[in-house]
Amino acid sequence: MPINENMVQEIVQEVMAKMQIADAPTGKHGIFKEMNDAIEAAKKSQLIVKKMSMDQREKIITCIRKKIKENAEVMARMGVEETGMGNVGDKILKHHLVADKTPGTEVITTTAWSGDRGLTLIEMGPFGVIGAITPCTNPSETILCNTMGMLAGGNTVVFNPHPAAIKTSIYAINLLNEASLECGGPDNIAVTVEKPTLETSNVMMKHKDIPLIAATGGPGVVTAVLSSGKRGIGAGAGNPPALVDETADVRKAATDIVNGCTFDNNLPCIAEKEIVAVSSIVDELMHYLVTENDCYLASKEEQDKLTEVVLAGGKLNRKCVGRDARTL
């Protein structure tokens, strides 16, 4: 069989990956006891990833997409069972959305301008090892989506997942590294620690080899990241209202609002959290919500009882977040 240059590059890449695995701190597919060891392993993997061609990175990303679809139901069930939040059916859909819609290397383009004064060329380059904090509300989906985009750019990722979703998070990280190895890439493209804590998060954020931090979570986490002194990307809690006025298709609005706000038990920050309706259509909207979308109009007494449970002691009762209505 004739040997071409591409085949030689693939063979060299595979050998380098195996050498890298042998030299890295011990960890099974990205899982380490110490955060510093996890970062060191990701750093060594990133030296390989950044030298990969776009085609080689895309090959790994394609394998990740395939594995996500194959394991969508498993991860959906794990997430619900471990955290008690959300519902399996919607989480399966979210995993398929991650697999189908997460951008890969196709969005990394070169831009050039030419004119009387010369040529300007803009090339995208990797940050290196990116630190990421992920929530229990959307554990595996966030890890998978983050890694695919970051890997496309030539980066590796160190995660500090929410402790309440560590089993699901580890499963996702194992999946990512298995996909990389199967396609000739290195292990430890995504890493974490066995027992994530606030301390491990601080170690990660302060580490000299972490130039960029991405955080998905509550306002406290996002504030900490954006004030860390490093470059940060924060995705915090959302509280989006749905505004319905007299120009709306009220019937369709009712259906769309219910579909959005009930998706995965209202866990996504982009899901509708309240309705603001003008007086001229409010009765019509309520009619469609109740008669065609299985909504229940609670009495004042029922609202007060629910408020006592959900806002126990004036604070959000986290045991109520993402639960089915019948559980509440």
Residue ranges and their predicted role:
Residues T110-K252:
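Rossmann-like NAD(P) dinucleotide-binding subdomain of oxidoreductase/dehydrogenase enzymes
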Residues A99-T102, T200-M204, E308-L311:
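Short, solvent-exposed polar/charged micro-motifs at secondary-structure junctions
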Residues P2-E10, G30-E40, K44, M52-K59, ...:
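Conserved active-site and cofactor/substrate-binding residues in soluble primary-metabolism enzymes
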Residues V222-T327:
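ALDH superfamily catalytic-core signature
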Residues P2-L121, G149, T291:
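N-terminal Rossmann-like NAD(P)+-binding subdomain of aldehyde/semialdehyde dehydrogenases
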